[in-house]
Amino acid sequence: MADITAALVKELRERTGAGMMECKKALVEAQGDIELAIDNMRKSGQAKAAKKAGRVAAEGVILTKIAQDGKYGVIIELNCETDFVAKDGGFKAFGDEVITAALNERITDVEALKAKFEEQRTALVAKISENINIRRLGVLEGGVLGSYLHGARIGVMVSAAGADEELVKHVAMHIAASKPEYVNADDVPADVVAREHQIQLDIAMQSGKPREIAEKMVEGRMRKFTGEISLTGQHFVMDPSKTVGQLLGEHGAKINNFIRFEVGEGIEKAEVDFAAEVAAMGKQF
């Protein structure tokens, strides 16, 4: 039997919204394979949908900067340990220096960016007594570039064609709010589509309908699925009567690419109380 850790149970609970006992049981049955556990829970109706792995648990800021000619832009995530330090003047100044260098020197590799600022980072850590990390760097080049920051925790950069700055800004704001994973439905990887198709087919077959009818039911569900995770298929947050794709079509524009960063995505802090709770629960198995 695979080792079912407290962290694994917690992640499954967060991604499915199911109860602790259901998550523990699903992981045991799936021998610790969290993705298989999610699929099985969805098929059985215990989980309607699964959130992406990882949760926001760190502090820090997202910064964006676009060159004066508007053709090159960078976005970075700079982490610290507490919200207090995230608002510190020295921390902010360090972030400004980092992103300015990334832009002006066209640095595209985060490890190279880290190496360039390691001495300054170490000095700042010693001064404020908190760990600091240049975690991520994203670059977009070409087209009409635009960015949007929602506070300091969510940042978006967009590259578009045939769009003005206002349209790009509105699309960036939509991305910040709606978290699309791909630009178009056709961009969704085949393995992601195949996995969801199998889940939906299994659910449809449970109704007792013939396979050909179940397949037709799944076709509609799959269109909805790919539409919900792709930018152009989502309903525009500022005018839900149309999709982002329809909005772009009205302006003769298209989105080339986008980057969305949120502080702490995928970083998890240990929570001892929850571990103790799961350990006690584990005695029932």
Curated annotation (Swiss-Prot):
GO terms for molecular function: translation elongation factor activity. InterPro entries: EF-Ts_dimer_sf (IPR036402), Transl_elong_EFTs/EF1B (IPR001816), Transl_elong_EFTs/EF1B_dimer (IPR014039), Transl_elong_Ts_CS (IPR018101), UBA-like_sf (IPR009060). PROSITE patterns: EF_TS_1 (PS01126), EF_TS_2 (PS01127). One of its GO terms (cellular component) is cytoplasm. The keyword Cytoplasm applies. Belongs to the EF-Ts family. This is Elongation factor Ts.
